[in-house]
């Protein structure tokens, strides 16, 4: 689940909540707020 997270979760919610952050879009509304440690 690191590939998909690094893709959109990189600037959204690049943590372990890829399945949650991707669905809920926690901060995913922006193009890329900030590279969260974990999405890479």
Curated annotation (Swiss-Prot):
Top-level taxon: Eukaryota
Disulfide bond sites: 12-28
UniProtKB keywords: Disulfide bond, Hypotensive agent, Secreted, Toxin, Vasoactive, Vasodilator
Transmembrane segments: none
Protein name in UniProt: Natriuretic peptide PpNP-b
Annotated tissue distribution: Expressed by the venom gland.
Family: Belongs to the natriuretic peptide family.
A GO cellular-component term linked to this record: extracellular region
Species this chain originates from: Pseudechis porphyriacus (Red-bellied black snake)
MF annotations from Gene Ontology: hormone activity; toxin activity
Record's function text: Snake venom natriuretic peptide that targets both NPR1 and NPR2. Exhibits hypotensive and vasodepressor activities.
Keyword Secreted: yes
């Amino acid at each position: 689940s690191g590939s998909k997270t690094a893709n959109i979760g990189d600037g959204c919610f690049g943590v372990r909540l890829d399945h949650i952050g991707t669905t809920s879009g926690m901060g995913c509304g922006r193009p890329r707020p900030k590279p969260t440690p974990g999405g890479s």
